[in-house]
């Protein structure tokens, strides 16, 4: 077997080509890990948002979009008096009538952005139990409460969404009264407004939905039967987890586009690496002949060349690891209904290492085999 140190020396003898191969491997591994992290983060964020005990009551025909839904006022009271399996807190049912509205928010300096605004009452904190008020308090009339990551979704500076700052919505100036979080969900990129205020600002008479928290998941059947029995109310019951699962399916093409872009760019980098390896190995044909002449067969030389290219792939992977850990880890990425946070898990890092190794093997095999095909006399006579 050719010594491992021989492979290292060959890489150091051609630092320019080695750096080119390492950079190409780094780019490919970085793209693959970023695509994997985006897919995982978006899917996990949407999955975390749904509570298995929560049911969303929406208008018939609006099961896939709460924003388009219309539910008559008073439905929450009707449901509370008709269904026995609703969780009670302080002798009150956990029912949250809500309006979900996509609208433009502006800062005082005129910067505007589209926000997902949720009109709620205090009971929303009972229903959405992941929500915690970090600073300040729940908004009173004329006030607004923002999620911890709302500034990322809106593209505003963090300082513009601090307590006491003013945001403008539909010509109304709203004072920020509190900041909340809901770790790992899309909720913490939302903006919450008192329900009655939002109905006034948007001139709406109906709700978007009613979110109900049940004592146990099997009580959903009673709630579903109620909506099917009361045809006059034109309601549909959908479990919150199922709603966000459908949203995740809706965003699946976007996640696939990330993979496709990573794949296409990786193919380009792979061909660039193949060209570099062909040039590098072709200039060493005489060296390969000399190694065969002293007793090493072609398979051992082939293995040594694959080890060389694999080393460049693994070094590129290590560089990519450094970039994701120091720069990309924890970055927030906005999308239409919120933000998700990139998280490079151990599985994703292992995928990156495997990609670098496979890239080295696949990239090194064709040029290595092509250079070892000539007979020993031909390689020794090669210029």
What residues fall within each predicted segment?
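A short amphipathic helical element positioned immediately N-terminal to and/or at the very start
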Residues: 3-12
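Short beta-strand boundary microenvironments
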Residues: 114-157
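Hydrophobic alpha-helical transmembrane segments
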Residues: 4, 18-22, 322-323, 346-354
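Hydrophobic, regular-secondary-structure patches
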Residues: 26, 30-114, 135-137, 200, ...
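Short cytosolic juxtamembrane segments of multi-pass membrane proteins
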Residues: 370-383
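Hydrophobic alpha-helical transmembrane segments of multi-pass inner-membrane transport and secretion
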Residues: 15-42, 252-287, 310-319, 362
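Mechanotransmission and gating elements of multispan inner-membrane complexes involved in transport
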Residues: 83-86, 106-112, 138, 150-152, ...
């Amino acid at each position: 077997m050719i010594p491992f140190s021989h492979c290292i020396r060959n890489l150091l003898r051609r630092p320019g080509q080695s750096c080119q191969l390492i950079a190409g491997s780094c780019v490919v591994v970085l793209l693959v890990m970023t695509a994997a992290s985006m897919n995982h983060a978006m899917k996990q964020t949407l999955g975390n948002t749904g509570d298995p005990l929560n049911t969303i009551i929406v208008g018939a025909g609006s099961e896939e979009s709460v924003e388009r839904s219309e539910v008559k006022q008073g439905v929450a009271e009707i449901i509370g008096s008709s269904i026995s399996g609703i969780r009670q807190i302080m002798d009150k049912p956990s029912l949250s009538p809500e309006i979900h509205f996509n609208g433009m928010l502006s800062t005082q300096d005129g910067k505007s952005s589209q926000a997902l605004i949720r009109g709620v009452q205090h009971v929303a904190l009972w229903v959405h139990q992941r929500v915690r008020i970090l600073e300040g308090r729940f908004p009173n009339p004329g006030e607004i409460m923002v999620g911890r990551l709302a500034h990322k979704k809106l593209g505003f500076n963090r300082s513009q969404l601090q307590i006491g700052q003013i945001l403008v919505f539909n010509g109304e100036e709203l004072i920020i009264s509190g900041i909340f979080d809901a770790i790992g969900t899309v909720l913490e990129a939302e903006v919450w407004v008192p329900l009655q205020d939002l109905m006034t600002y948007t001139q709406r008479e109906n709700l978007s939905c009613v979110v109900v928290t049940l004592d146990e998941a099997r009580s959903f059947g009673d709630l579903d039967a109620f909506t099917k029995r009361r045809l006059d109310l034109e309601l549909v019951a959908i479990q919150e987890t199922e709603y966000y699962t459908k949203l995740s399916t809706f965003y699946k093409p976007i996640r696939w586009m990330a993979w496709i872009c990573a794949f296409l760019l990786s193919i380009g980098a792979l061909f660039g690496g193949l060209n570099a390896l062909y040039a590098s190995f072709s200039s060493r044909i005489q060296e390969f002949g000399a190694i065969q002449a002293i007793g090493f067969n072609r398979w051992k030389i082939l293995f040594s060349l694959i080890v060389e290219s694999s080393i460049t792939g693994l070094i590129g992977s290590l560089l990519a690891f450094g970039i994701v850990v120091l720069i990309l880890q924890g970055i927030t990425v906005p999308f239409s209904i919120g933000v998700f946070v990139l998280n490079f898990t151990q599985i994703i890092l292992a995928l990156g290492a495997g990609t670098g190794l496979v890239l080295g093997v696949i990239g090194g095999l064709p040029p290595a085999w092509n250079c070892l095909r000539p007979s020993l006399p031909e390689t020794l006579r090669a210029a």
